[in-house]
Amino acid sequence: MGRESRHYRKRSASRGRSGSRSRSRSPSDKRSKRGDDRRSRSRDRDRRRERSRSRDKRRSRSRDRKRLRRSRSRERDRSRERRRSRSRDRRRSRSRSRGRRSRSSSPGSKSKKAENRSRSKEKAEGGDSSKEKKKDKDDKEDEKEKDAGNFDQNKLEEEMRKRKERVEKWREEQRKKAMENIGELKKEIEEMKQGKKWSLEDDDDDEDDPAEAEKEGNEMEDEELDPLDAYMEEVKEEVKKFNMRSVKGGAGNEKKSGPTVTKVVTVVTTKKAVVDADKKKGELMENDQDAMEYSSEEEEVDLQTALTGYQTKQRKLLEPVDHGKIEYEPFRKNFYVEVPELAKMSQEEVNVFRLEMEGITVKGKGCPKPIKSWVQCGISMKILNSLKKHGYEKPTPIQTQAIPAIMSGRDLIGIAKTGSGKTIAFLLPMFRHIMDQRSLEEGEGPIAVIMTPTRELALQITKECKKFSKTLGLRVVCVYGGTGISEQIAELKRGAEIIVCTPGRMIDMLAANSGRVTNLRRVTYVVLDEADRMFDMGFEPQVMRIVDNVRPDRQTVMFSATFPRAMEALARRILSKPIEVQVGGRSVVCSDVEQQVIVIEEEKKFLKLLELLGHYQESGSVIIFVDKQEHADGLLKDLMRASYPCMSLHGGIDQYDRDSIINDFKNGTCKLLVATSVAARGLDVKHLILVVNYSCPNHYEDYVHRAGRTGRAGNKGYAYTFITEDQARYAGDIIKALELSGTAVPPDLEKLWSDFKDQQKAEGKIIKKSSGFSGKGFKFDETEQALANERKKLQKAALGLQDSDDEDAAVDIDEQIESMFNSKKRVKDMAAPGTSSAPAPTAGNAEKLEIAKRLALRINAQKNLGIESQVDVMQQATNAILRGGPLLAPTVSAKTIAEQLAEKINAKLNYVPLEKQEEERQEGGQSESFKRYEEELEINDFPQTARWKVTSKEALQRISEYSEAAITIRGTYFPPGKEPKEGERKIYLAIESANELAVQKAKAEITRLIKEELIRLQNSYQPTNKGRYKVL
């Protein structure tokens, strides 16, 4: 009611304003106006309700038609609003005119009152009927709107129907054309069959057939064209015409400037064949992104050309830098300030202190005195707190002398046993060195680079470095192979003060993206951890390439547990006036490790290993070291069968798996690890109690590092080494390691070594101790390039692709295979097969018997070796037993031994003495015989797959059937470097036949199979580092 009253007041006020001219109003006029007001109010309410209803209806309808006719619905709404506004204006004008009429007709007010009353009654009675009429009107309006919508829908449907009719008509026309073309083609084909016969002159006609076939294909494709595709083709044609018009217009404009454009126009207009060919490829190639992704076959690049281009690019990027042309920022290396307590120490006190600290020996001038506590080395409080937090109470012997020497800015060679804290010895001075320099700007490389030989050691150093770098606000990036390079590139681009890397991946980073990933301009501190392995011949080129790109006045530090004398000369090439700090002698196993060496047979090693595992595994973790990846996997299977859960770690495992295996082993998830020497360096595992050298280490340094995995940080450890009699040459290094570490040498090991020395002396050989540093890496020189070219020539020759200049290469590979065969040919005269029954004694037989007796007498005369020699060995033994004397070995003269040795040598050299040939001729001169041809092909030194291919049952059977020769496999396989014992032979194929041609055919087929396999191996060859460690 409040709203109605307000409305009533507003309406009355408006009426008061409109009727302000006649101020004198009668009571009857007021009543009639009130009635009119009431009626108008009721009408307004009805109108509002009806409008709201109509709005709801319209909304629901508009929702249904929204997707198809949004714009039309908006126009209808606007037209409705216009109609409503017009109707409102009409109502207002009518109400105003009524008011004027009421004011002008005041004299006949009574009659009008009566009329008004009667009208009000009629309206009151017919109120319901008026409402119904209004509803009818609204329904009619809605129906009109529906009709309008239906009209639009019908119009759309009509358009679609016409479009379909056009498409159907077009399809029908296409079908008719296709049928006509097919009929014509059939007629032509029949005419050609009837009227033509093939001749050499018709070769030119065959060239036209593909074009006709293409036409037929295009016409058949047109039959199955979808209407939408046809429409899109029309659009493309229009776009193309538009582009051609624009090109022609541009050409016409440019035609005035010079004659060159005229040539372009003529090319476009005359070369129709090119345009047709382009049509088949696709339209608008400049706008077709999908088509641009595919390159044409004509633009293929030669693989070898691309490879050589890449190699030359790599060489350019990694060439040594001319440091004289670069202005480097000055930096400070000497930060060490000697505290008064150390300054007061005399030289004698310093020597005594060094002797107490496990016998520190120092070489080099100007070495500072060793420190006694962390506060004396000049590090910040943040680092001191971190040291205390992580349990570093006091410096170890190597740290006491190495830290002040490095803080003084000197180059250093640090030699200390495993687990002695070498990592902290070079990390603490590095932090002080970096903090003294300005912070990195965008695009600048690191300040410190730490290089390691293995990925595991790189990860371990990174983990140790991050303990301190977080508090100092420094960034550390570990760069190593085997993982995705993109993440490492992203980290380097963000900037890092410290890079821990393996040399191979570091070179990749320096060469990546034309050297924009990182650079070595800011590097002033270089660390080589495990420096002896870094300077092994396999690693030297990569290490030197990185070091040569660093500024010459850098500070370089080297650390290792072993440092052979042969490596010192190489190390001094990159050091300037170094100080050598050695702790505890060179390469010594820690005294906390109890070492045991067991001389054992190969078959009993696994049972002994199970015994050790049963005794030690409950006390902690165990590492078993083997020499090869295959042995690691084989031993893993054997241990799993014996119910020992374990894991294997070697260079052939993916890097992600290697990381997870090391983490599981460190965390104690798995307590047994079978590994090659990949895990022997820098791997720090807590609670590692036992190391088993299942395969004996082949040099001293390898033994030291293997045994050094246990007994770290003052804990007790055990190291067992298995050695067989065949591995006696390694016993000397193990005896040396035991003696230097103060461990008693087992007597059976000493006996094994002394027997081996005696044997070598008897054979006239010199005993050489292997240092383990004889591996060779890639030298990137002309010799290697020549070898690579030779390999390519052999491949070309084998495949028949050689040039006329390279015809000799075809013979080379056959000559190499022939030399490896080391073939031995023999021709034997065999007796002709006859009847098994003995022949009757005839005159001929008697003559043969006489010849045999004479030969026997002559042999006895030639071999007149005394009375004992005429009696056989059995007779000698019988005589000894009858006499009752001791049974002695039968006496054999030196001449007999010499003859036996000569026969063996002759057999090896495939030599038949002349005397024997004469005897055979005399024996077989009058007998019926046939020749048997034999040839032996030694295949022991060929690759395993080549041997398998030749010695397979199917291959031998196929060769025998083809050549009609018998082929047998004889001898045993001996690995490279191992010579067969007396009476044994390397594996070989024996070919036998009565026909010499059959033997030659069999040999040629065997040669062909081996050649194919060798070529296949060369093509699939991946250059790998055969050493124990890899730079990845």
UniProtKB/Swiss-Prot annotation:
Instruction: List the InterPro entries hit by this protein, alphabetically.
Output: DEAD/DEAH_box_helicase_dom, Helicase_ATP-bd, Helicase_C-like, P-loop_NTPase, PRP5/DDX46/KHDC4_KH, RNA-helicase_DEAD-box_CS, RNA_helicase_DEAD_Q_motif
Keywords per UniProt:
Acetylation, ATP-binding, Coiled coil, Helicase, Hydrolase, Isopeptide bond, Lipoprotein, mRNA processing, mRNA splicing, Myristate, Nucleotide-binding, Nucleus, Phosphoprotein, RNA-binding, Spliceosome, Ubl conjugation
Q: Which residues form a coiled coil?
A: 152-197
Keyword presence, Transmembrane helix = no
Record-listed Phosphoserine modification sites:
199, 295-296, 346, 804, 929
- CDD domains, sorted: DEADc_DDX46, KH-I_DDX46, SF2_C_DEAD
* Regions of compositional bias (Basic residues) in chain numbering: 1-24, 50-73, 81-103
SUPFAM superfamilies of this UniProt entry? P-loop containing nucleoside triphosphate hydrolases
- Where is the segment annotated Disordered? 1-227
Q: Which reaction does it catalyse?
A: ATP + H2O = ADP + phosphate + H(+)
Q: Where is the composition biased (Basic and acidic residues)?
A: 26-49, 112-200
For the cross-link Glycyl lysine isopeptide (Lys-Gly) (interchain with G-Cter in SUMO2), the position is 186, 325, 779, 908, 916
Q: Which GO terms describe its biological process?
A: mRNA splicing, via spliceosome; U2-type prespliceosome assembly
Comp. bias intervals (Acidic residues): 201-211
- Phosphotyrosine PTM positions: 294
Q: Name one GO molecular function term.
A: RNA helicase activity
Task: List the N-myristoyl glycine lipid attachment residues.
Answer: 2
Gene3D superfamilies to which the protein is assigned, alphabetical: P-loop containing nucleotide triphosphate hydrolases (3.40.50.300)
Purpose of the protein: Component of the 17S U2 SnRNP complex of the spliceosome, a large ribonucleoprotein complex that removes introns from transcribed pre-mRNAs. The 17S U2 SnRNP complex (1) directly participates in early spliceosome assembly and (2) mediates recognition of the intron branch site during pre-mRNA splicing by promoting the selection of the pre-mRNA branch-site adenosine, the nucleophile for the first step of splicing. Within the 17S U2 SnRNP complex, DDX46 plays essential roles during assembly of pre-spliceosome and proofreading of the branch site.
PANTHER family (UniProt xref): ATP-DEPENDENT RNA HELICASE DBP3
The similarity comment for this entry is: Belongs to the DEAD box helicase family. DDX46/PRP5 subfamily.
Share what the entry says about its subunit structure, partners included.
Component of the 17S U2 SnRNP complex, a ribonucleoprotein complex that contains small nuclear RNA (snRNA) U2 and a number of specific proteins. Within the 17S U2 SnRNP complex, DDX46 is part of the SF3B subcomplex, which is required for 'A' complex assembly formed by the stable binding of U2 snRNP to the branchpoint sequence in pre-mRNA. Recruited to the 17S U2 SnRNP complex following release of DDX42; DDX42 and DDX46 bind the SF3B subcomplex in a competitive manner.
- What name does this protein carry? Probable ATP-dependent RNA helicase DDX46
Q: Which gene encodes it?
A: Ddx46
